[in-house]
């Protein structure tokens, strides 16, 4: 326990070798139960050498894009073969469902595709044709910035209403295709989105669009990043002792979704298999919620386990209130916020306790020996 600002705070300390032991390989679990979804985003540019299909219920393959004609396409010709290899995992887990995620960071084309009834229908028909051609099980839309001028993508004020209409049209076409293709029950074509909080809600009709979706993948991460003024837990479950009133966290995001009337079983909580580093950090509170000089970079968990968590130069702290770990290098003034098995188990308990629909993560190749995936799968029992 540490003393700070005259208050006793629940932050524990684990150094070097002990932190390394804490991140050790867990026992191989049984598959996750059917009532909870365990969803892996798999990136086409970073395909894992092996995938434990029996530990997953769904895979979202990233990314397809929207071309200049408003149609769903793979920009990289290698992605078709990558998707085929994911679909082959059904031989080991027949209940596995593989969706194609359309969009992503800096993905353009959504505003135009959603603009008119004609463009929406063209997009929906192309999505159905794309699924049929590749024998995939559904579409996940990752339109991260409807109605917002972020990442240089085209946007319009009417994106807010048009997104709902786009999902409605897509749902209708997917349902018609399910009927035509004799896909029933769990085999029907799925439709999901990646959702966020705060500004995302201001520019979408979350209280209306969710009726067209099978579920929503809440991006419960990136709360602190290169655009925030201070460090903080980028994937904290709750607010830290030192958090400002407006700081973001996963619980607040879930509550915002619930307040919009979205059924809790439709909410899938996302976790991050990577950390974020900040350099030149003010040393107060061991770097937590402090100003910094520059954003240092992203850190996949697999690389962190070997190079950072096990390093004598870093001290691992556990923030009990936020249910989040972080690393602090006092000499280098380097702060790293990340997820580990302990924080993921805490989120899995939260999912169970709140009756949510499961967990997803970005992205599978950033794990090490299934350490984080095992924390999810074992905790979903």
In which residue ranges do the predicted regions lie?
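Acidic/aromatic/glycine-rich contiguous surface patches that form carbohydrate-binding/processing clefts
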Residues: 276, 339-381
